[in-house]
């Protein structure tokens, strides 16, 4: 059996500033949490080697700035993405309401081959905060995800490391499926022109 080439999966993490994108990424890759992260300027990324269905892949996780003034940097960072993670804070209604805009922004900037089927995953972060402060219910988030084509949804806490590995396992699996479908369809990009010459001088037998 021939050895498979190494696979690099590019995953973009989007959401408003302060929802915990950097914390989620650091908890997943480095198993660390800090309450004093500075706002991401532009974009940053971390990598982690993971096994997806017996296949070794490298996850390249891009943490992009949530501030509007950096959204114009999007094209270069979004292109070639295999999965997009949309993050909001369950205690912040504005961050949840912004998910639609982040999703649309990604699809416009990244221009995936098959937009309706591009894999997204939604994370409702900061569930460690006391329940009384929560403003977005699980039901409301699930309804949003179902309306967008049954996007996988996880409620997470970067601080308490809740559902982090489970969420990123689904992210990795969906990203790999996307990468493989892109690879497959890429084999058929070049049209084949078949031109048949009429042999006018030949006999019509």
Swiss-Prot record:
GTP binds at residues 17-23, 33-40, 66, 125-128, 157-159. Alternates between an inactive form bound to GDP and an active form bound to GTP. Activated by guanine nucleotide-exchange factors (GEFs), and inactivated by GTPase-activating proteins (GAPs). It comes from the Eukaryota. GO terms for biological process: regulation of vacuole fusion, non-autophagic. A motif (Effector region) lies at residues 37-45. This is Ypt/Rab-type GTPase Rab7. It comes from Gibberella zeae (strain ATCC MYA-4620 / CBS 123657 / FGSC 9075 / NRRL 31084 / PH-1). The gene is RAB7. One of its GO terms (molecular function) is GTPase activity. Ypt/Rab-type GTPases are key regulators of membrane trafficking and intracellular vesicular transport. They act as molecular switches that convert between GTP-bound and GDP-bound states, and regulate virtually all steps of membrane traffic from the formation of the transport vesicle at the donor membrane to its fusion at the target membrane. In the GDP-bound state, Ypt proteins are predominantly cytosolic, solubilized through the interaction with a GDP dissociation inhibitor (GDI). CDD domains: Rab7 (cd01862). The modification Cysteine methyl ester is found at residue 205. SMART domains: RAB, RAN, RAS, RHO. Belongs to the small GTPase superfamily. Rab family. Its main location: membrane. It is found in: Late endosome membrane; Vacuole membrane. It is a lipid-anchor. The keyword Signal does not apply.
